[in-house]
Amino acid sequence: MTAETNSLSGNPQRAINTNVNGQSNQGVNTRIDGTQDAYPWLPANVAYVPPADAIQEVNVVTNSFDAEQGLAGGAAVNVQIKSGTNQFHGTGVWFTTNQDLTARNYFQTDIKLFPTKNSNHQNQFGGTFGGPIVKNKLFFFVDYEGTLQRNLAGPDTRSLPTAAMLSGDFRNLPGNPIIYDPATGNATGQGKQQISCNGVLNMICPNRIDYASAQMSQLLAPSVAQEFTTANGLNNFSGSGTASFTRNNADIKINYLPNPRAMIFGHYSFSKSLVFDPPLLGNAGGDATNGGQLGDAPGMIQSVGLGGTYTFTPNLLLDWNFGFTRQNLSATFDLGSPDGLDLLKIPGTNGAGVPNGNDLYNGLPAFQVNSASSSVNFGNPNTGNPFQFRDNQYVTGANLSWNRGKHSLRGGIEWNHTQLNHFQPQGGTFQTARGSFLFNGNVTSLPGTTPTYFNSVADFLLGLPNQTGKAYQVFNPSLCDGHSGLGTFAISGR
């Protein structure tokens, strides 16, 4: 068994992975009241985790699987939600923890440097209630669990251009870096001269600053902190933000006994979640301070199950079920407008001409300002953002059991259907859906030398990237996968 996997936005249920019998963690098939509870895109996880107080029992089979327990190599797990009874029963729970109840971060034990622990408030609360609607006939059970988490994300230290640098002034910087003019010298870069503006060396004239870079500089302005000094070196900015995680899980189950021979049940489960991971540089984007997906990540998971039994004779029993599970998860950031096209005026980043173009291509491109000594990202650098998963699962089946003496015979049929409908253009570690631009300092340095961070910033201001790229989703992947089976087995007593 492993800890919670994947990001909060990709796994808001905080499902864990389990290896059984030495098999892959993808070999565990989990159901809730017979309804498939798989996560098609991340099959080591489950789609929905009901509140602990809502669970009546968990049946785990790890070997000698029955014919009806397919799609499992390690374990077949069936979780049963509680049912109402002839008596009203209810429970309530509240759990809380904060930074005062937890240990210090292993890397923040120096009280002089870190006088206080990062704020971390977690609250989980809920309850259950069940009872009769019509005694001996109709019963109900409901439960709810809310999770609220707010924590200080960061601090995260970066090197940011100063206000003077963003205006083109690269004088009086640590190490006295020289910014070379790419408009001078030959095609191989030999013969470059130090850049100047009106005779002032290491100055970029305002009319040479790229329009997109100037617009990004305005977004960066509120984040620019202190000047570079010998004491702090390149790390002149420390940012943090308040990350949040909100989740509401609930189940409703109805049981109906129309006559002594029959029983019918139905359940509806849902989980609505919202994850927020603040960008390091506010409106200018940057890396996520909590290490996940930038911005908001809403999610909605729903599960519906119907089932029942019918006793024809004391020896002959029919059981059946139907289930539907839907996942709708997404992670988005700055999608309100095509900023790359409208604000920065960079063609091809958003809008018309984008294959399968839609609002999910909106937002700021990624600007990576890198050097051997430091790096910083502007815009939206996350190569997996945005994403939208809309996955459906259907399952239906029926079994007929016959018993006589020490012998039993059971047969059945099941149909299982899975649909994937995803949007997530991915381009490795560089390309994003909105376009990516890398500035590594080579443009404003001499060939054969090691560019400094300040050369990289100068490249950015001049609008001369060393590398560009963009991730396109040429077609929207849509997968349908179905399984059906018919099985019988007999058991004879000794």
What are these regions (language model features)?
Residues M1-R494:
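Short acidic-glycine motifs
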